Amino acid sequence: MFTTSSIIDNLNQSEGLEYKKLCRLLKITKKSDKDKLDIALTALEKLEIINKNEDDEYTCIKNSDHLVAKIRCSSKGYCFAVRGKEEEDIYIKENLLNYAWNGDKVLVRIIKEGYRRRSPEGIVDCILERSNQILLSKVEIINNDVYAIPIDDRILSKIKLPKENKKYTFKADNKNIVKVEIDRFPIGQEEGLGHVIQELKLNNNEEYDTDFVLSKSNIVKSYNLNNLDSKKTEKRDRIDLTDKNSYLFKSWNSNNSPMLPMIQIEQEKNKSTKLWIHTNNLAERIDLTSKKSLEILFKGFESLPLLNDWQNYLSEAIRNDSEFKLDEKNEAISLCLHLDSDNEIINWSFHLTLVKCSLIVRSEHTEALLTRKSKSRITSRVLKPIKEYIEDLDKILEISCSFRQRHILEGKVEIPSPLNNIEALKEFFIHNPAEYSKGYFESLNKGDCQTYLSSILYEANLIWFKHSNQYGLKSAGYISKGIDYVNANEIIKYSEFIDNDIELNEDGNCTFSQVIKLCGDDNKKRILHKLLINEFNNNEIRLISKNIDNDESEKLFISPWTIPGFDFTNLINQYCIFNMIINGKKSKKNNINPINISESNSLDLVNWDIFNSSISKNLEILFNKFVIDKLNEFKYKVNQYKSNMINIKKVRKAEKLLGNIYSGFILSVQTYGFFVEISELNVEGLVHVSTLNNDWYEYRSRQNLLIGRKSKKSYKVGDAIEVKIIKVDILKYQIDLELT
């Protein structure tokens, strides 16, 4: 189904499109769909967003007054059109939303310019794309009609349901929420219409938790992955490395988890090393020039953890053909790093290879390797069966630690992963070496072998940015922002968690890493880590090209490609590498004096475009603003989902312990109360100011505390207190506490 956004995106990418060509691009063949397209085109013309020239071609009006934005609403009903980080938000009054909902992509027209500290005001003229096709709602009867009332109070509409949906009327005891599919969005004087597709009875019932949280995060799996075919790979020249030992480091337990790369090590006599990273050859298996494949991939850009399982973004057929299996030959796309005796990277090269997995390295292996007392005598029952591989594994772990040490010296920050004591959430807390949306590193952890894979893959991903950028190729990736933006005043608020004996360096400073280590108490340390994590912004995926803005030219870029089984970003970067290896031009003209463009030694020798126009056109379909925006939208939903899934399971845990009393620490203080972490349970809850009935408490922002007017009793971050669990709200993921 096409959207207004897809019409405008197609028109923006061309000088002019005839009606038939537009239909072809939008895959419209049915008369009913063409009728809808006609209505949309007429409306867009009247709004002066597009026009039709004398050649009967549709084009976007370049200097239109309309701005593309996303609607963001608060629970109190205030709505803004958000344009971007550098642009000012536009305030939209409720009566000027024209039924745009929170999260919708819209075209906004400014009707009143901003002045002083007031935001500009605007009106929504066109809804480009709806973010909600499924609504979680309560069913209520209003004037004998049946309506779905969204549980998300940022959505300011109700949906009319058929009479037969009356049986789903909300009962507080059952907490019976329904999933409503929208048949027609509200427009003009017409109400929105929908129908119930599923009832979720949430009260003391964990069966529907995953379904509930996925729907609340707007992640709807309405597509069939089996339609994503696995291509048969062509016979190509590959380096045969099947006689060498390759190691697959894996902590994830689910069979459905993302496929991981393998590491191979070759130690030379002069103490230099060849370090190979072998990645699953998905770029060869998936036809990224096929509209059918892209249509499926665009509906789910990333694999995500469920309870004790994963929702993979790739079909089972593709995974079966590409996954590295023990003692089986596999085709791979590989990077070879040449390291000196100090584990510094001297040069690198990309290759097509044939490999074989010798050992699946588990977390018990890394723990035994890193905690053993003697390196000459093997006594561990875990290590005895893998005795022949220990020398290689020791070297891989040494290289991983060297790389990480270098990253920290360059200014990166390491924070340990939060603790988890809920068995169902185990896969959520295992380190994901493909995750770069966080602004910090998770610490190397001998109990999680994937953390040691992470620092090696980080280098491999940095290298693809350097290589692709030198050739003027686009890539999808992240900017490493450093920590300059972190608010020092917020960190000062957490001083209650830090020991008093702080040592400053000769410049009178204390590094961020030192601050993290200054807390002695384990419970306080864990809470400090949690608070510090909140100070880091999430990184967004960026379209990286040769023409980097001046203010970004000194920043560190990373272009992930090593785990294409995790997400679309890795896949398209790997696809670019694959094309460089098999289709890249090796000389300026007719292969005279060809050079190996896959080697780092060739980077300064190439002064020509390495791809012809056909390959460049295929890559342009993948590397453009539209795709990057979609990737970020999906990534935002997935991050919301993961956070909410953890929260609902914590609430479920507290639900079984109502009335119990626990010790805790104050995490943060607000005008309406303070949040407390119960260390024993690893859950957080709110003590509302209204429950502090022994005095009138006021919030002092400078000191970040609540203080009683009469008693002068204060509550601040880091205070140890005792609380009772009095109430939980599954729908809002909230735990209410009171002081004892």
Locations of the language-model features?
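Short beta-strand-to-coil "C-cap" segments at the C-terminal boundary of structured domains/repeats
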Residues: 200, 738-740
